[in-house]
Amino acid sequence: MVTLRADEISNIIRERIEQYNIGVKIVNTGTVLQVGDGIARIHGLDEVMAGELVEFEEGTIGIALNLESNNVGVVLMGDGLMIQEGSSVKATGRIAQIPVSEAYLGRVINALAKPIDGRGEISASESRLIESPAPGIISRRSVYEPLQTGLIAIDSMIPIGRGQRELIIGDRQTGKTAVATDTILNQKGQNVICVYVAIGQKASSVAQVVTTFQERGAMEYTIVVAETADSPATLQYLAPYTGAALAEYFMHREQHTSIIYDDLSKQAQAYRQMSLLLRRPPGREAYPGDVFYLHSRLLERAAKSSSRLGEGSMTALPIVETQSGDVSAYIPTNVISITDGQIFLSADLFNAGIRPAINVGISVSRVGSAAQIKAMKQVAGKSKLELAQFAELEAFAQFASDLDKATQNQLARGQRLRELLKQSQSDPLAVEEQIATIYTGANGYLDPLEIGQVKKFLVQLRTYLKKNKSQFKEIISSTKTFTEEAEALLKGAVQEQIELFLLQEQT
């Protein structure tokens, strides 16, 4: 039998006492009362903050949204299938935040900034709050630089500036995503970082967009944030804020960014689902009372920074889906009132083969010509008015049998102007090509052509300018003005090509 001496026992006890650590940690905990439909009711958590992250026993994270007198309503960031009634929940003391870094460029991530493209982890040393306050008046300056979309109809008549918020609105299947993705493709070489946020879309649609970006080399300056239709409502609600936090990171580093929210109708629906399950009182169209604030606090984060802050910018292009062209519904009117203009896409124009199907009459940019280079202002200044007059005249001409020559000429000119605004998808045009195209139409050079020949001729003209008149591009790029020299070059090229084209068509 082993005998222990008294001094050995006292040594062991002394060591144990020295090793004993009296670290007292206060943890704010609660108990699950009920769970289901992506919502949990928690008893306890007396000191939890609104919007604080809470952690369940089995690892699921949630956000405390409803702070009531006898329980806390938590929305889950996962399916929560393993959460049991009576299990414990602890407050983390943190508000939702994500890691941010340059390494996110070219990646596809979810609303929690975790990669979902199967290309490994993303290293990041900094983090940003998902929800941060919008820049104040002093830290902004007015929008003055253009953000070229590559679409003639937009860049000439509804110009978008860096730091602007321009809504893209229309029915389903009218080409809203196509306008947004073409804008991203056109930023190649423009030193603009793009963030594309897909909310509640089919995974196949998102994959198609990502494939287009990869094929056209756009992923190197783009981040895709995707929460598809099968994601929990909480993550669909958070995705736009995650995208905004990433875009803000680059904006504060004196870079230009552009962010597309595709689309905010789905985010509002996800928020409505969460709010109704949390028993918040419903308002118009069953949306909660703060659905306006949901979108305003997101879109107000887009800004053009002042010179003191480095002149970075964040341009927001939110997309909203309408039902049968009803622009006066709740979410469309909300977002229209928040943004600095809207691009309205019409199903009738789309079905008539006018693509992009932009209704120039009710589309508007509240920044206007401040977001255009001088050359574009000089050439396209009257285009919108001419097209609006043409649309009015066309409607009237349907009922009139005999029209005078001047009216017939105006109708013919209008039809050709409308024709030159048509563009194929994923085929953005450089600004000098747009200027050449509009000048050709506005000055009547297309009048001798049949409407069906316009597109073919314009392709031929742009190819000729690129190959043989490169100085035209150089003048526009360097001076940003449509000088007399540039006009003379363009006029000569157009006249020469028209004659050549008509000869080719006759033979």
Swiss-Prot record:
One of its GO terms (molecular function) is ATP binding. Keywords: ATP synthesis, ATP-binding, CF(1), Chloroplast, Hydrogen ion transport, Ion transport, Membrane, Nucleotide-binding, Plastid, Thylakoid, Translocase, Transport. PROSITE patterns: ATPASE_ALPHA_BETA (PS00152). It is an enzyme of class 7 (translocase). It is found in: Plastid, Chloroplast thylakoid membrane. Disulfide bonds: none annotated. ATP binds at residues 170-177. The record marks 363 as: Required for activity. The keyword Cell membrane does not apply. The keyword Iron does not apply. Belongs to the ATPase alpha/beta chains family. Produces ATP from ADP in the presence of a proton gradient across the membrane. The alpha chain is a regulatory subunit. This is ATP synthase subunit alpha, chloroplastic. It comes from Dioscorea elephantipes.
